[in-house]
């Protein structure tokens, strides 16, 4: 599990793209020239940006070679760069920085977010969506299984919170629109939940384990999911998935 798996990630493409669609709908920009898609993955969010602004120069940035290769294949009209978001520098100031489900993986948001704002043109927009599920059973159970099996904590840090992000971006000179939405995804089985998180949140926990260790981890994780996520009357499982949305417009 040394690299991201585009096919596994796209297995739930509709569910993963829906927050990007809703974030994009709140971006108050019309004719723009320069766009960056931070953590573009296989290009599903980049495609939405290209559809809305076909004449813009859109650059997707991702640290995964596999994801970048998939995105380049799918969107030859866009530019893609394999790079760390924290170190990447655009060639010119940007009109829009779009980050759908990527910045939660990076530390030091008190420094990162003002840095990203500094890359914008005046009236430019930073649009961010981040999973806010650190306290959801899916993620709590990852930590519990790791503790039971004596593995180190490899989960990401919790988000800073609504009030913190508002203050960070306001102090950076932005007008801020911020909201939180909980999606309830219909999952056919507990294994489907595992398939979902294996492509994202579960990766850090599994990537350094042997195959047998991964099997033991996932077996216990599956047992604990069954305890926390009951079946509905029709046999489906409702997976609650909170997400935090931010649209910050640089007013300088």
From Swiss-Prot:
GO annotation, biological process: methylation
GO molecular function ontology, one term from the record: trans-aconitate 2-methyltransferase activity
Enzyme class (EC, first level): transferase
InterPro entries: Methyltransf_25, SAM-dependent_MTases_sf, Trans-aconitate_MeTrfase, Trans_acon_MeTrfase_C
Catalytically driven reaction(s): trans-aconitate + S-adenosyl-L-methionine = (E)-3-(methoxycarbonyl)pent-2-enedioate + S-adenosyl-L-homocysteine
Localization in the cell: Cytoplasm
Alphabetical list of Pfam families matching this protein: Methyltransf_25
Key words of the record: Cytoplasm, Methyltransferase, S-adenosyl-L-methionine, Transferase
An example Gene Ontology CC term for this record: cytoplasm
Highest taxon listed in the record's lineage: Bacteria
Database matches in Gene3D superfamilies: S-adenosyl-L-methionine-dependent methyltransferases, Vaccinia Virus protein VP39
EC assignment: 2.1.1.144
SUPFAM superfamilies on file: S-adenosyl-L-methionine-dependent methyltransferases
CDD domains: AdoMet_MTases
Classification via PANTHER family: TRANS-ACONITATE 2-METHYLTRANSFERASE (PTHR43861:SF1), TRANS-ACONITATE 2-METHYLTRANSFERASE-RELATED (PTHR43861)
Stated role: Catalyzes the S-adenosylmethionine monomethyl esterification of trans-aconitate.
Family, similarity comment: Belongs to the methyltransferase superfamily. Tam family.
HAMAP family to which the protein is assigned, alphabetical: Tran_acon_Me_trans
Protein name (record): Trans-aconitate 2-methyltransferase
Annotated source species: Escherichia coli O139:H28 (strain E24377A / ETEC)
Upper lineage: Bacteria, Pseudomonadati, Pseudomonadota, Gammaproteobacteria, Enterobacterales
Gene from which the chain derives: tam
